[in-house]
């Protein structure tokens, strides 16, 4: 199975540092079946691809993420052969070995990701609206082909992941859960294929997590991985308030996810 990972990049010094961390860790030498592309906006009317970076003709800021996504997928559809397209960002770690050997978990006629619920009402989307989080959208060819027909200007002011979920839902696609680990949410490292390492409080912590998680997955033995797992947790304890409450919240969240699948 051929996989293309499209990472939303740009938007400031912090994102630049996160991208560099990705380039020297998990994305440094991907297997031939997996291609990693960083996606940026630029002035002008042309698409430019260089050094695994795709520049698309739109603004390179937070409010243009949906437009950038649509243009990026449009280019990939025309220039790459793939079975699975993953849209993500620069603060996410992917275990490419697991990704490359876990083909059976991906439903190419549906859309995969991690479900979340909105915390407030956003236009016609009520509080509690259930959607796939944008840090990992797993799209087969049918879904990616549908997305390039999406008109981004009809979703102004709506978060890109809610807009994408709503559009694909109205197009008749079904959705399925792909578990991820979010270190900033509960500070407990679960070695999944996708690990969200973003820190909202300390920019340097995102990079430290990227490095530590990468070292874990490079371990060749159980003891090596155990010791490196401990290093990840020690880093979380040092940099955050890891408590029994956070562990309890993590377990409750996992239980709720299973009930909602």
Q: Which residues does each PLM region occupy?
A:
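N-proximal low-complexity "stem/linker" segments adjacent to membrane-targeting elements
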Residues: 1-20
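Conserved, well-structured core segments
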Residues: 4-8, 36, 136-138
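Short beta-strand/turn micro-motifs composed of small residues
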Residues: 7-9, 40, 88
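Short, acidic, metal-binding catalytic loop of nucleotide-sugar glycosyltransferases
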Residues: 18-34
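Short, hydrophobic beta-strand segments that form beta-sheet elements in well-ordered domains
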Residues: 32-43, 112
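Active-site-proximal specificity loops/subdomain of glycosyltransferases
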Residues: 38-82, 96-97
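Conserved catalytic core of nucleotide-sugar-dependent glycosyltransferases
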Residues: 66, 84, 88, 92-166, ...
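C-terminal catalytic/acceptor-binding lobe
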Residues: 154-261
């Amino acid at each position: 199975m051929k996989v293309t990972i499209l990472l939303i990049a740009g938007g400031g010094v912090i994102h630049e540092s996160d991208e560099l961390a990705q380039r020297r860790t998990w994305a440094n030498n991907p297997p031939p079946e997996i291609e990693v592309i960083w996606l940026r906006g630029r002035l002008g009317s042309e698409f430019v691809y260089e050094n695994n970076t795709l520049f698309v003709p739109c603004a390179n800021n937070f409010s243009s993420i949906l437009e950038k996504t649509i243009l990026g997928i449009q280019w990939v559809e025309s220039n790459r052969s793939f079975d699975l397209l993953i849209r993500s960002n620069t603060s996410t770690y992917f275990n490419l070995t697991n990704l490359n050997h876990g083909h059976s978990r991906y439903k190419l006629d549906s859309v995969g990701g991690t479900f979340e619920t909105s915390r407030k009402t956003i236009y016609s989307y009520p509080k509690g609206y259930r959607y796939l989080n944008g840090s990992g959208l797993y799209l087969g060819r049918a879904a990616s082909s549908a997305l390039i027909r999406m008109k981004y200007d009809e979703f102004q002011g709506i978060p890109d992941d809610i807009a994408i979920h709503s559009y694909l839902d109205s197009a008749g696609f079904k959705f399925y859960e792909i578990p991820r680990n979010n270190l900033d949410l509960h500070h407990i490292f679960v070695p999944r294929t996708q690990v969200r390492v973003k820190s909202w409080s300390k920019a340097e912590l995102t990079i430290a997590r990227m490095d530590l998680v990468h070292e874990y997955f490079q371990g060749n033995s159980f003891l090596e991985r155990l010791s490196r797992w401990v290093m990840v947790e020690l880093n979380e304890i040092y940099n955050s308030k890891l408590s029994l409450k956070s562990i309890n919240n993590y377990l409750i969240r996992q239980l709720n996810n299973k009930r909602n699948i």
